[in-house]
Amino acid sequence: MANLLKTVVTGCSCPLLSNLGSCKGLRVKKDFLRTFYTHQELWCKAPVKPGIPYKQLTVGVPKEIFQNEKRVALSPAGVQNLVKQGFNVVVESGAGEASKFSDDHYRVAGAQIQGAKEVLASDLVVKVRAPMVNPTLGVHEADLLKTSGTLISFIYPAQNPELLNKLSQRKTTVLAMDQVPRVTIAQGYDALSSMANIAGYKAVVLAANHFGRFFTGQITAAGKVPPAKILIVGGGVAGLASAGAAKSMGAIVRGFDTRAAALEQFKSLGAEPLEVDLKESGEGQGGYAKEMSKEFIEAEMKLFAQQCKEVDILISTALIPGKKAPVLFNKEMIESMKEGSVVVDLAAEAGGNFETTKPGELYIHKGITHIGYTDLPSRMATQASTLYSNNITKLLKAISPDKDNFYFDVKDDFDFGTMGHVIRGTVVMKDGKVIFPAPTPKNIPQGAPVKQKTVAELEAEKAATITPFRKTMSTASAYTAGLTGILGLGIAAPNLAFSQMVTTFGLAGIVGYHTVWGVTPALHSPLMSVTNAISGLTAVGGLALMGGHLYPSTTSQGLAALAAFISSVNIAGGFLVTQRMLDMFKRPTDPPEYNYLYLLPAGTFVGGYLAALYSGYNIEQIMYLGSGLCCVGALAGLSTQGTARLGNALGMIGVAGGLAATLGVLKPGPELLAQMSGAMALGGTIGLTIAKRIQISDLPQLVAAFHSLVGLAAVLTCIAEYIIEYPHFATDAAANLTKIVAYLGTYIGGVTFSGSLIAYGKLQGLLKSAPLLLPGRHLLNAGLLAASVGGIIPFMVDPSFTTGITCLGSVSALSAVMGVTLTAAIGGADMPVVITVLNSYSGWALCAEGFLLNNNLLTIVGALIGSSGAILSYIMCVAMNRSLANVILGGYGTTSTAGGKPMEISGTHTEINLDNAIDMIREANSIIITPGYGLCAAKAQYPIADLVKMLTEQGKKVRFGIHPVAGRMPGQLNVLLAEAGVPYDIVLEMDEINHDFPDTDLVLVIGANDTVNSAAQEDPNSIIAGMPVLEVWKSKQVIVMKRSLGVGYAAVDNPIFYKPNTAMLLGDAKKTCDALQAKVRESYQK
């Protein structure tokens, strides 16, 4: 029994029981029970993690001893990453000298410098070349490895069975960098591709060095120089790198490959893809082309023979895994080339693609320079070592993602393209046992993968299905419906005044439509602010209905006074905020301004009217026309930076003239005038105070709050007008029209009022920005709409005052509730559309007042504002590829979303620190910054502006790319950057800058996610499919500054985080921007 108990307890994973086997039976029971009752938490202890803690492991970086090998396995930056992960790192003295990395660099990075024997005895050894005999020590490097240690290096196991035998004797675990599977998830640690990229670039540089002419064509005074013609055979990594380098140097580049996808890549780089007449796919496994048929090879040879007579430089990269390189160019072809031509054989190490190649040598054969070097990556040792180091550090992090322990599991059962595939393919020996080659993975794609159609291609196919007849019929039907509606309005018109008002409304809408389209996107925020101020003309309605003496004497007069007071807040506050924003766009180099001179036309307009009124002239309609034209001019003035301040001045003149004309029509007595003046003065003072104190970053919520005032003023005016006009309904032929307009204006005003308050609460942080998705909200909204529409029936049928005022009160409440339910269901990121829609609503509410009071000015201005908001809403929706109904009803997905399973994102991301980011910024000549709402939230515009100023002074080309919906209202980011002093001429819109990304060295993405998400173009099943985005991933390097890798508002993973040219700089945007600014300043001062 004791032996049985000993067996049980020693086999138990709980440390509590591991030492009980030697105890006597009774004592065992007593201690067991006591321990159980006093240390119960140990029974719930988590299982011990597998592997060895990083801090107990040492990574060794020996010096490469292969002849002419200048690379080193780890750069100082790589050492720093491993030390940060927890490893101890030792580097052989002088290991990085040939790569321009001194021992001091490694010490600063956290490594210790030791001798060759000590380094090779490390737990984990990383090398470039496979272990070989060390001539200095007189011993094979494999014999110096630690027993049961780990080696990471290029191994080529199929060609080196003797080396595997030596490593097996040391019970070594070997990861062969040359065996990393060429699958998407492994791109970051594909060392063969990294080295091939360098070889391809170096091949062009060497060819240019030995070629006797310019690559680019030139016309000089001495004569014309034709461009060099280059043929590149093989569209793999090396071939494409060669094509890119040669094209950038101005040569005419031609590319050949047996794979259609590779030819497409040649074409995308600007090279001319060459094909043979015979159609045969060359798609093979592992990223290589397959061997072709005899007929295809004969056609290929014919093409090559023809090209040899035309081109100046030949670069060939064709390899077949595990076999001798195919001879593609025989001696006769080479000798047919022009004297002075150059051939570069990147397959020389495997025998070469040219019959005349001498591996490892440079020589001239009958005037043709042959470059057959087999160590091209080593000839760019610094760059090659850096990339190889990145490959190794990423591989280690990927195979052992645990934060504390180093551990990876090698399994023979794995799926294609997974991390298990990468580990099993890379590990060629486990604890001394050779496990190469890896077994075949499961779920291998059969043949060439079918290329998924892009969103643009699907949209083009969809457009092609619409026949010209159907398209024309759709247009004709729309015009037919519109003209029929106009005829219906004419028939239903109760009098001539209504027809004239409809005419005014229609013409004003057309003028507003064309005027607003001319406004530059950078000025959309000032546009909304000035329309907010102009919408304060609801004060006209309030003034027209005010009465009494020093105080209102009836309910309707009180409502009117309140409407005038509220509207005055909008007028004064709106114009002041607009002026503040426009002042921020001023540049130090701009000429002086004399805006006070606009007092001259203002004084002439208002003073002239007062003089005419005193002389007995009734020119109020002309005043309304002039005021309306000034309001049109206000919107038109905002089309450019140069006329924006004139636009704001015209808006003030228009509103002042309209108010003056209204007072002239009313001719109030002294006491009533005092009441009007007091209400407007108080409201204006409050508006000026708010506008003066508001921070520009809080502009969206201010606009939303001002919208609510317009909506409330419209409701009050409509109800007051009903109360005042009710006694005349029995004798007024237009009574029904007045009632309909009053009801409609009350409904629109109620929705605008409550919806704006909810938008304000979300933007101000008083309410959660996340959408409030009430159960059955669509049915609820439909019920509220039906009740609101149904309320007009008793309102129109029953002539009693009680029924009428009850219906107006009910629709006010119903519309207010509907405004809450609609806006609450919309998330914070959709606020740009919400604000523009509310802006449009306020315009239509103003139009309703114009019809109600038969006032041309209100109708004109309302149509301008309504069309302005509608156009901005349309622009925002187009920028998200969503319908307005989708946004307003709290929906998700774009109009292009296919609805299938979204694309799976694979791969690993690359994280960098501030020093790495500074190095990338320092090396870049052209930089684009793409800010998002994260910049607004963090208020990081000031350090970014200072950073841009310093970089510009260093001669770098720095610009901003702004997405239309990057912020919480249109143009918000433009205003924030202007506030920080960024010149507006370097702040470009998405459509203006998207075509520049491919030529940009570096993009800084600050606090943006969905607006730079490549899934919008790459994944037809994404919910943001078809959404126009900033194409930052097309640039050479991208740094994404975010708090985490989390999703954006659309809850869609962003593939750019995992692209090979993207680096993640994680952290708080404000702190990161401050740190970047400080680091650049420090570097700048040096």
Curated annotation (Swiss-Prot):
Protein name per the record: NAD(P) transhydrogenase, mitochondrial
Q: Which residues lie on this side of the membrane: Cytoplasmic?
A: 723-739
Q: Which SUPFAM superfamilies does this one have?
A: DHS-like NAD/FAD-binding domain, Formate/glycerate dehydrogenase catalytic domain-like, NAD(P)-binding Rossmann-fold domains
Enzyme Commission code: 7.1.1.1
Which membrane topology describes this protein? Multi-pass membrane protein
Which keywords are on file for this protein?
A: Acetylation, Disease variant, Membrane, Mitochondrion, Mitochondrion inner membrane, NAD, NADP, Nucleotide-binding, Transit peptide, Translocase, Transmembrane, Transmembrane helix
Q: Which residues carry this modification: N6-succinyllysine?
A: 117, 224, 294, 331, 1079
Enumerate the Mitochondrial matrix topological stretches. Answer: 44-474, 579-595, 880-1086
| Tissues where this protein is expressed | Widely expressed with expression most readily detectable in adrenal, heart, kidney, thyroid and adipose tissues.
> What are the TM regions of this chain, as residue ranges?
475-493, 501-521, 527-546, 558-578, 596-616, 622-642, 646-666, 672-691, 702-722, 740-760, 778-797, 801-819, 833-853, 857-879
Which residues does this entry mark as bearing N6-acetyllysine? 70, 397
Q: Name one GO cellular component term.
A: respiratory chain complex
Family to which the UniProt record says this protein belongs: In the N-terminal section; belongs to the AlaDH/PNT family. In the C-terminal section; belongs to the PNT beta subunit family.
